[in-house]
A protein has these predicted regions:
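Charge-rich, N-proximal long alpha-helical rod segments
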Residues: 1-45
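Structured alpha/beta interaction-core segments
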Residues: 50-133
Length: 133
């Protein structure tokens, strides 16, 4: 049986350590990009809120096209609006602002839309929940 060369073993270990470092740096880079994208997309949500509020008061085709285009871009990036109205209240998806007349523990009103990014909460919705009158 041939003797193991200690220098060869040390070189193999160093090479394996280097390969692990490369993998770890790449994983960190991907996580950082996801974090930055999440922060950026979250900052766009109040802009959508403002544009939708303006759209409700001003009937302008250009404004509607701009809102639709922004929503399309967000959708392409994995941002989805939550549809919570008339569904069971889920504290993981929404914050309850107040209890209101309506079916117990069911969302009866949405004060601020909530959004998901790749099926994770980007911004929780702010809702009114039925108190079961």
């Amino acid at each position: 049986m041939a003797k193991k060369n200690p220098q060869e073993e040390q070189l193999k270990r160093a090479l394996a350590d280097y390969q692990n470092l490369i993998k770890r740096v790449e994983a960190d880079r991907v996580e950082f990009i996801k974090y930055v994208l999440t922060q950026f997309l979250a900052k766009l949500l109040p802009v959508i809120d403002d544009l939708e509020a303006a759209e409700a008061h001003i009937k302008d085709q250009g404004l509607t096209l701009a809102v639709d285009k922004l929503k399309t871009i967000l959708n392409e990036e994995g941002v989805k609006e939550m549809a919570l109205l008339n569904r069971a209240f889920d504290p993981k998806l929404a914050e309850c602002l107040e209890l209101a007349p309506g079916k117990k523990d069911q969302v009866v009103g949405v004060a601020q839309k909530g959004y998901l990014l790749n099926d994770k909460v980007l911004r929780p919705a702010r809702v009114k929940v039925g108190k079961g009158d």
